[in-house]
Amino acid sequence: MSSVSAAGATPPASPGCIAGIGMDLLRIERIERALARHGDRFAQKILGPEELAKFHARRRRDPARGVRFLATRFAAKEAFSKAIGLGMRMPMSWRRVQTLNALGGRPVLVIGAELADWFDARFGAAHVSITDESDMAAAYVIVERKPAPDGRP
């Protein structure tokens, strides 16, 4: 909910304010069916290069873990596309944003060069949270407003 001033106008945002929120929830079996139907082409269409390497490594060790990995990354990309207000249309595409892990394991969004200029001109930081449990995978993305050049709201 946005606050409204007495004059009826929305007050200006301060740096670090939320510009967009995206969420995606999906059944993991949906990803299993897509993999069964399309094989590795499905993973190659969805995942960026680092994600794809991790997917193959996890799937070799445990096929179910590979599917869960793909499902969480699919959800993160959907959530990100919603947070930035584009959906899956240019300059956004599946492979132009990856969800990788920081040293401590925290998921981080890595925006590819083809999308970075567009994103950086409009937004500040992006944050992601992903989870999977039982038969579901989910992701939440929060995108911050771009701070003003002088740092003022």
Curated annotation (Swiss-Prot):
Transmembrane spans: none
Spell out the subcellular localization from the entry.
Cytoplasm
Q: Which UniProt keywords apply?
A: Cytoplasm, Fatty acid biosynthesis, Fatty acid metabolism, Lipid biosynthesis, Lipid metabolism, Magnesium, Metal-binding, Transferase
Catalytic reaction(s) noted = apo-[ACP] + CoA = holo-[ACP] + adenosine 3',5'-bisphosphate + H(+)
Q: Which domain of life is it from?
A: Bacteria
What does the entry list under GO cellular component?
cytoplasm
Annotated Mg(2+) binding lies at: 24, 78
Cofactor(s) named in the record: Mg(2+)
Q: Does the keyword Cytoplasm belong to this entry?
A: yes
Q: Which SUPFAM superfamilies did the record assign?
A: 4'-phosphopantetheinyl transferase (SSF56214)
- What EC number(s) are associated with this protein in UniProt? 2.7.8.7
Query: GO molecular function terms here?
Result: holo-[acyl-carrier-protein] synthase activity; magnesium ion binding
Query: Mind listing the GO biological process terms from this record?
Result: fatty acid biosynthetic process
Cited function:
Transfers the 4'-phosphopantetheine moiety from coenzyme A to a Ser of acyl-carrier-protein.
Q: Which HAMAP family match?
A: AcpS (MF_00101)
| Protein family (similarity comment) | Belongs to the P-Pant transferase superfamily. AcpS family.
**This protein is called what?**
Holo-[acyl-carrier-protein] synthase
* Organism listed in the record: Bordetella parapertussis (strain 12822 / ATCC BAA-587 / NCTC 13253)
Underlying gene: acpS
